[in-house]
From Swiss-Prot:
Gene Ontology biological-process entries: translation
Pfam families, per the entry: Ribosomal_L24e
SUPFAM superfamilies attached to this UniProt entry: Glucocorticoid receptor-like (DNA-binding domain) (SSF57716)
SMART domains, alphabetized: TRASH (SM00746)
Cofactor binding description: Binds 1 zinc ion per subunit.
NCBIfam families listed in its UniProt record: PRK14891.1-1
Entry-linked PROSITE patterns: RIBOSOMAL_L24E
Gene: rpl24e
Name listed for the protein in its UniProt record: Large ribosomal subunit protein eL24
Length: 62
């Protein structure tokens, strides 16, 4: 089993945990928590939210 990466916050997902969401166009999204899934469905972008690893990675030097 392999570890996955959350499509919203870039957090790690252990094998057997998380949730998989398949969009109508066939692309697959992996979520580590319901918080990430709900924010994605609301149309929010992970790189603009301070609690995500994506935001922390982009704004590391600032």
């Amino acid at each position: 089993m392999e570890w996955k990466t959350c499509s919203f916050c870039e957090g790690t997902i252990e094998p057997g945990c998380g949730k998989k969401y398949v969009k109508k166009d066939g692309s697959v999204m992996h979520f580590c928590s319901s918080k990430c899934e709900k924010n994605f469905k609301l149309g929010r972008v992970g790189r603009k939210l301070k609690w995500t690893n994506t935001f922390k990675r982009i704004n590391r030097g600032q």
